[in-house]
């Protein structure tokens, strides 16, 4: 019976000497969705992707990727997946067209289909004017579009993207995500790692990794509703004094300054968070406007990673 999941991982772990990079990871990635990996550098995102691609052998555990067990028959998996590395890894001394043609030959795309498929990708990814340009001379956004075009040239069922927008401008990031949604709508499953909170919110589902451990997963809405935190926003004439007063409260988990506003996380078992903040600031003679607000993805990330840190102590 065919699975509804493109990826199923059970106890997937990887150690490098004494370093546990990924620990007993459990994953279920539905088909035709964008599944995000959110976490800081060193959290195990890239290591996990490389294990799922068959490029790294797990220390323990296994995964089923598009019906193929890894470790096991990685060779049969390669034609079904695309992989875009974090660092631009195409040939700088080849033109855009030559890079695409080279990838087509690697994946044994029939020669009669080369020209049509490459022209289609040049058009779809706005690279027609750059087709004869050497890849090394392109901007970050152009290189990103070329790398994505190469990754999808052979029409993979599953696409792995390792922090693909880490070196491009905001407009290029938005355009890139528009392309990802079109791919998902056409049936491609996408796993994308990121440390951008706004990108995490665009995913259909995501997992949050911290020190190689999955500390939360679900849809962005599910994660935001399950933080166990109340979030209040404080606008004060003296943000620094307000931050000092609130950060000193035992009930407060986190205080972050955003311009003249403060974003305050308070566990939901402490009662009315607005009243708590008002009393604390009034006691210091600080005048402020305080309102409760929904949790953002950054709030979710702070809450779950702090909870994980507390469990490790």
Which residues are covered by each model-predicted region?
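Conserved catalytic motifs of ABC-family nucleotide-binding domains
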Residues: 155
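Hydrophobic anchor residue at the start of the ABC signature
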Residues: 148
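Catalytic Walker B motif of ABC-type/P-loop ATPase nucleotide-binding domains
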Residues: 159-162
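Conserved ABC ATPase "signature" region
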Residues: 101, 105, 110-130
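Conserved ABC transporter NBD signature motif
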Residues: 61-72, 76-77
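Conserved ABC ATPase signature
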Residues: 93, 134-138
């Amino acid at each position: 019976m065919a699975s509804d999941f493109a990826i199923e991982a059970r106890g997937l772990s990887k150690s490098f000497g004494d370093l546990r990079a990924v620990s007993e990871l459990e994953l279920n990635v539905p088909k035709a969705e964008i599944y995000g990996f959110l976490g800081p550098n060193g959290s195990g995102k890239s290591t996990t992707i490389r294990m799922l691609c068959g490029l790294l052998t797990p220390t323990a555990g296994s995964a089923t990727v598009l019906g193929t067990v890894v470790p096991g028959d990685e060779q049969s998996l390669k034609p079904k997946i695309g992989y875009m590395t974090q660092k631009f890894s195409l040939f700088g001394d080849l033109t855009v067209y030559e890079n695409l043609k080279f990838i087509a030959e690697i994946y044994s795309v029939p020669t009669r289909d080369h020209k049509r498929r490459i022209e289609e990708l040049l058009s779809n990814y706005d690279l027609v004017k750059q087709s004869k340009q050497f890849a090394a001379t392109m901007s970050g956004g152009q290189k990103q579009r070329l790398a994505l075009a190469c990754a999808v040239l052979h029409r993979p069922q599953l696409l792995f993207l390792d922090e693909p927008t880490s070196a491009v401008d905001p407009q290029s990031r938005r355009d890139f995500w528009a392309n990802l949604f079109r791919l998902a709508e056409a049936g491609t499953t996408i796993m994308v790692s990121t440390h951008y909170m706004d990108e995490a919110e665009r995913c259909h589902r995501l997992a949050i990794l911290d020190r190689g451990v999955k500390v939360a997963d679900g849809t962005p809405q599910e994660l935001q509703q399950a933080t166990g935190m109340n979030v209040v926003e404080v606008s004060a004439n003296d943000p620094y004094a307000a931050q000092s007063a609130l950060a000193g409260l035992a009930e407060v988990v986190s205080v972050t300054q955003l311009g003249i506003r403060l974003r305050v996380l308070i566990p939901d078992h402490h009662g009315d968070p607005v009243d708590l903040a008002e009393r604390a600031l009034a006691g210091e003679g600080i005048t402020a406007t305080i309102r409760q607000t929904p949790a953002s993805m950054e709030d979710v990330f702070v809450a779950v990673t702090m909870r994980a840190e507390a469990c490790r102590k």
